[in-house]
Amino acid sequence: RTGLLPKALEGALSGSVPWDGKVAIELPYRGSASYKVDVNADLKNVSSHLPAPVDKQAGEPLPVNIKVDGGLSSFTLAGSVGAKNHINSRWLLGHKLTLDRAILTTDSKAVSPLPEQPGVELNMPPMDGAQWLALFQGGAANDVSSNMVFPEQVTLRTPVLTMAGQSWNNVSLVSQPGAGGTKIEAQGRE
């Protein structure tokens, strides 16, 4: 248990993660401190009962390689989960840990550049929207640590989104704050 994830997410995960890390810290006589962290792990012993594409049986190897590079005010966290899933993110260090921007790409060969604007971009494989909606209605976004801040703009792209017995192709969903609430824009090929 991490204590960082909402209960609905943490309850869907079980297992342990062996890992190896390297930390390098620079404390110059003049100038700012900096650090680099490399973490290698294997999620082989972890099972996930979350909806696809993050479902996983224990026993399936899933290597994770993460690199962190930062200073006293921010850090970048980038790496891979498996051979084809890559993440790149920038975090700000203040009174609260703030995810400034991030991009997750599946079926990719390398880490993508960070988005130009604050927000999160999720480039996912085909998804079952009903399963994900049920997860979020069950509290998956509740009880996020009060010590963390996440971007209000989220973009989700998927080649196929299935929901309510229908399939939509090349879907892009953008959620952002609007007057009086959250505004969601959807675009697709159909």
Question: What is the meaning of each model-derived region?
Answer:
Residues 1-77, 90-190:
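Membrane-proximal interfacial segments on either side of biological membranes
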Residues 82-86, 190:
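Glycine-centered tight beta-turn/hairpin loop motif at sheet-sheet or coil-to-beta transitions
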